């Protein structure tokens, strides 16, 4: 088991041997670059005519109407052997272009493209971060409280109908502009807080096992909550679905499954719901991808909701990849799901036809979620690996891929380090990247941990088309927390970045530190931004709201 605890280690002897290694001396080596070692594949959009033809066909057919991609399996899919646990047809339609019908941040990084964790528009005048409220969680043995990796909250603006029938405390049942923060904690509880004040809005749900990943809410605004369990401490390990009318558990799906090829049953990934199919999609650390028909029956007048899940499980084996397990949150473009595994292989899976389209070779553990960019109807993917299987030193591989063909558009390799042993703490890419929009359009921003030194970090921006570096920012402390882009009313862009010693940075869109605040403990979790507020959990047992002024 790979424990994700962001601990700062001092390892002078190890660093001495690492820094003297000729494989990490970049000038004059085969990895030469002024900052980043790079095996760059120049933009294949303009160079590979066969790929361009494929892209153009997809654009022509899909650009005008949001409909399922009709893709045939490519030769790389033959490197897979796969099966489904049954022939049940779970998905019949592509994920809708508009993921949700209610305001909120409902899954990790917002939705199927996994591209950002923000909502609303921010007004920034003083360019300063100020703490506004904090909430102290309880603690579990060995894991404490607060939030770990990925640990992003969901935020929802409930419609009045649901607000009235749920088990909210009375003062919140009729509160106007009510937004609720839903946060899974390492103490084994799901907490519910008022976004404005940080006060509890209802009693927590206790699963009695640490929650490391990010919870998810139903995009229809139905009072349904998905919770993945990170660590087994009591009872069985698996994923749970709860009613938010009364907090009751509606379904438990065990992670220890005889159908899987791996005996680790955690769920760190955040689920997605296809509201047109009443269906849910999530990957497990047991190596299975779960297609779940919910069969939801919701009667708000009677204050009742129930589900009758029917599950079809996808399993696979890939040549030259013996590592099973999906820790990232599955990304989806229409009917094509994308995920990476603990070996670093990346797959495209048609969830309607229930078959893989392509599968790229393994490299190294890839836990950061894949981010999708929709370019005129063609999906492009941005992804990166950790430094894990490579040992105590290696390269985080950063890639842009064509989501239709799996071909590499450009690639970078960034040097870094990892701590191995019984308590490994990996370097490389663990935070999920950002594909910019508006004033950040044309940029993709990655956050690399353990760069240059064991404690160092790197924030780096690339041109999405060419892969050329636009800017970089060296950070004194590494970060597993995902970067969030903040867009203002005056058409400016800022970045929010937490790090492993509790610093939260406000950074300009060109990579300059503007302001910072220390929140007292490691920020391993990924924040969300709602208007002027940044909400994030720390390993110090707190949820904290920071105001952007």
Predicted features along the sequence, with ranges:
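Sec-dependent N-terminal signal peptides of Gram-positive bacterial secreted proteins and lipoproteins
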Residues: 2-27
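Intrinsic disorder/low-complexity segments enriched in polar/small residues
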Residues: 3-5, 31-33, 41, 49, ...
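Intrinsically disordered, low-complexity serine/threonine-rich segments
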Residues: 12-13, 40-41, 467
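Intrinsic-disorder/low-complexity peptide segments enriched for small residues
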Residues: 12-13, 22, 33, 248, ...
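Sec-dependent signal peptide cleavage junction
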Residues: 18-38, 43
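Extracytoplasmic/lumenal domain signature
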Residues: 44-91, 115-267, 272-549
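Predominantly extracellular/luminal regions of secreted and cell-surface proteins
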Residues: 95-121
């Amino acid at each position: 088991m790979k424990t994700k605890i962001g601990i700062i280690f001092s390892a002078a002897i190890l660093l001495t041997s690492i820094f003297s290694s000729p494989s990490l001396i970049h000038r004059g080596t085969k990895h030469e670059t002024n900052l980043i070692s790079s095996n760059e594949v120049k933009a294949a959009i303009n160079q590979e005519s066969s790929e361009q033809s494929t892209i153009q066909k997809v654009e022509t057919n899909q650009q005008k109407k949001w409909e399922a991609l009709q893709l045939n399996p490519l030769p790389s899919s033959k490197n897979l052997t796969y099966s489904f646990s049954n022939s049940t047809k779970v998905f019949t339609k592509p994920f809708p272009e508009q993921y949700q019908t209610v305001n909120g941040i409902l899954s990790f990084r917002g939705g199927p493209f996994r591209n950002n964790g923000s909502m609303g528009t921010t007004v920034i005048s003083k360019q300063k971060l100020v703490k506004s409220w904090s909430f102290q969680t309880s603690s579990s043995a060995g894991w404490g409280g607060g939030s770990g990796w990925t640990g992003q909250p969901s935020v929802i603006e409930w419609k009045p109908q649901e607000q009235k029938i749920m088990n909210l405390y009375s003062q919140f049942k009729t509160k106007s502009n009510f937004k609720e923060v839903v946060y899974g904690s390492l103490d084994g509880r799901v907490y519910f807080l008022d976004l404005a004040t940080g006060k509890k809005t209802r009693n927590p749900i206790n699963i009695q096992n640490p929650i490391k990943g990010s919870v998810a809410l139903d995009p229809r605004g139905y009072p349904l909550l998905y919770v993945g369990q990170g660590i087994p401490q009591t009872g069985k390990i698996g994923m749970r679905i709860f009613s938010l009318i009364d907090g009751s558990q509606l379904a438990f799906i065990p992670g220890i499954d005889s159908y899987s090829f791996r005996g680790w049953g955690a769920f760190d990934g955040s689920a997605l719901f296809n509201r047109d199919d009443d269906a849910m999609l999530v990957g497990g650390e047991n190596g299975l991808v779960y297609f779940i028909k919910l069969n939801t029956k919701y009667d708000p007048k009677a204050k009742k909701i129930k589900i009758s899940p029917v599950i079809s499980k996808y399993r696979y084996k890939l040549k030259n990849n013996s590592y099973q397990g999906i820790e990232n949150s599955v990304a989806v473009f229409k009917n094509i799901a994308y995920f990476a595994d603990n070996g670093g292989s990346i797959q495209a899976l048609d969830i309607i036809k229930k078959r893989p389209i392509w599968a790229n070779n393994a490299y190294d553990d890839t836990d950061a979620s894949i981010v999708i960019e929709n370019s005129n109807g063609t999906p492009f993917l941005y992804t990166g690996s950790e430094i894990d299987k490579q040992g105590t030193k290696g390269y985080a591989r950063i890639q842009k891929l064509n989501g239709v063909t799996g071909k590499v558009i450009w690639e970078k390799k960034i040097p870094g380090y990892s701590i191995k042993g019984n308590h490994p703490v990996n370097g490389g890419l663990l935070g999920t990247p950002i594909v910019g929009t508006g004033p950040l359009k044309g940029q993709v921003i990655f956050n690399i941990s353990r760069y240059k030194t064991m404690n160092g970090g790197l924030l780096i921006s690339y041109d999405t088309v060419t892969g050329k570096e636009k800017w970089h920012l060296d950070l004194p402390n590494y970060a597993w927390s995902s970067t969030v882009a903040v867009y203002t009313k005056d058409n400016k862009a800022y970045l929010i970045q937490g790090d492993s010693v509790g610093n939260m940075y406000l950074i300009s869109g060109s990579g300059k530190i503007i302001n910072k605040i220390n929140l007292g403990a490691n920020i391993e979790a990924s924040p969300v931004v709602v208007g002027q507020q940044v909400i994030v959990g720390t390993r110090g047992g707190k949820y904290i709201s920071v105001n952007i002024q």
